[in-house]
Curated annotation (Swiss-Prot):
GO terms for cellular component: plasma membrane. This is Putative branched-chain amino acid carrier protein SERP0977. Keywords: Amino-acid transport, Cell membrane, Membrane, Transmembrane, Transmembrane helix, Transport. Its main location: membrane. Belongs to the branched chain amino acid transporter family. It comes from the Bacteria. The keyword Transport applies. InterPro entries: Brnchd-chn_aa_trnsp_Livcs (IPR004685).
Amino acid sequence: MNKNTWIIGFTLFAMFFGAGNLIFPTQLGLESGHFFWPAILAFALTGIGLPLLGVVVGALDKHGYIGSFNKISPRFSLIFLIIIYLTIGPLFAIPRTASTSFEMTVTPIAHNSGNLALFIFTVIYFLIVLYLCLNPNKMIDRIGSLLTPLLLITIVAMIIKGFVDFGGHSSNYGMTNAYHSNLSGFSQGFTQGYLTMDAIASIAFSMIVVNAIKTTGIQHADKIFKQTIIAGLIAAIALVFIYISLGYIGNHINIPSDTLKELKAKDQNIGTYLLTTMATKGFGTFGKYLLGIIVSLACLTTACGLIVSVSEYFHRIIPKIPYKVFVVFFILVSFILANQGLNSVIKMSVPVLSVIYPVAITVILLILIARFIPTKRIAQQIPLIIVAIESILSLITTQGWIRISLIDSLPLKEYSLEWFPIAVVATLVGYMISYFVKQSNIVYQKE
């Protein structure tokens, strides 16, 4: 393993690692109670395992996911990538960076979480983002290269102090209505992992990793594939350590029920409160300020990277509209949504992610299968169509818009995993039907 592989591995870690990756495992630890381990392991599966798999699978074709998706259907490739870029961009991920920064800085320091304070903060925040994105230079890279090690060192220090301060406490009782068995803990952790959005982000990040490996002089697809796996494992190990550690500490922080009620009444995010509690307990007032500033800078650089990526993609598919117009438009959309507050942004993302994630997981696995088993286009199209339809119908039923009894009776519906057995059966059916269809097998381009 050479130096470049380590650098690429930690670069991938930096791309995946954001404030949301701190909030969700910590809150999961608190809420899971005695069913912490099945919950956190399932969370790691969707929050780390799937993103790792997503990056690796993207290296199977020299054109990345654009090439792989085009082999399924050019129309699917265009529509699904647009949905993914909007999801990890202006609709959810970018607004979340602003609202998270607000809750990690202004709320704990000024004890003010009002709408006016949020509005003023997001105006300043997105003006900085606008300036950096309209004038992209090495400033963002320099901030990122300095910030990531500093953020990692700070979090590790906080984790060590957290184990000292809270590790001896007994596990809290958690949310017994949602976490009442090992299986329910697993299913809750699995779906909570959706909120990191890293699995769908891996589809966008994969090409960045592949190009970075190519710049080191490696050109053969098999060697690129191997280096991608190693780099992905480096990032995954770092994320596993942080997720489990933060979750474990969150599981052993005893928050009075009155405090939880007060947080819910103020619509303040519990995860950010737990992190601030850890920092303050460990390092006093200094820890609260330091964590707030570092997380805000991490969110800022993440927002800039996402705005640039999304704007460049849309400029590529709609070249008549200038890049800067997309930048301004997506920042305005992000600004409006960020002012709904962190909890509102998270709540809005849940229904959308419940549809996107099953499709994303299915397509990643189908591409991986096609790498080893001769596969025709229709064998991938059938399960994707069925999973997409089932996910939409399940969302409609879950939200109570229309009650569909068939959806309620599906296996694993209670655990929000009803799409998985359907995906397995649909894949088997797709491959059987493909034997009777005259199509050439999918071949991923290596050179």
